[in-house]
């Protein structure tokens, strides 16, 4: 997909986990490696990772630091979109290591340019951190950050967006890993 960029959000402080989540191992590979593997067939080298951690440089994709630090995932999305050269962008948070190429490709196929965001919906809950973002939403994100309104869901709810119901077969891919307990359960 030449007209789209993959953006991996890996700049979080991982306070609940106590360590950098993207470097946690699952089946012998880091979380970030699993996500990159899912994105790579779709975008090749057209991938950005938002993180200040140089340990992510092994991936070989462009690593950028938050333009406006300490603004959470919204700041990471803003940074990724600012560095992106494409209109459409697939954003994936580093704490979702189970996403597959098939899910991301399907999600992108459901996106329409009528929407600024297409986010996934599982069991009535939206996931704006595995979503398609139109680069032009940078303006609204910049305004939200300036007003210190940092909740990604609030931003998405305030723009033209669509919620895409995830088929049953892919629901397990959207498990977020934020605590040591969740990580231990994932490894079982």
Predicted feature residues:
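Nucleotide and nucleotide-moiety/phosphate-recognizing core
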Residues: 1-149, 157-171, 180-181, 187
């Amino acid at each position: 997909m030449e007209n789209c960029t993959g953006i991996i959000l890996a700049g979080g402080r991982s306070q609940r986990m106590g360590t950098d989540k993207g470097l946690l191992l699952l089946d012998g590979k880091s979380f970030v490696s699993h996500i990159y593997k899912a994105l790579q067939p779709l975008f090749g080298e057209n991938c950005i990772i938002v993180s200040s951690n140089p340990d992510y440089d092994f991936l070989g994709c462009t690593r950028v630091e938050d333009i406006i630090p300490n603004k959470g995932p919204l700041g990471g999305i803003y940074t990724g979109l600012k560095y992106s050269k494409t209109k459409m962008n697939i954003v994936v948070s580093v704490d979702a290591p189970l996403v597959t190429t098939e899910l991301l490709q399907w999600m992108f196929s459901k996106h329409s340019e009528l929407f600024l965001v297409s986010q996934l919906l599982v069991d009535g809950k939206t996931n704006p951190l595995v979503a398609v973002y139109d680069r032009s939403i940078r303006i609204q994100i910049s305004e939200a950050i300036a007003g210190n309104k940092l909740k990604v869901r609030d931003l998405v709810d305030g723009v033209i967006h669509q919620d895409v119901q995830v088929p049953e077969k892919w629901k397990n891919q959207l498990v977020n890993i934020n605590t040591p307990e969740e990580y231990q359960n994932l490894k079982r």
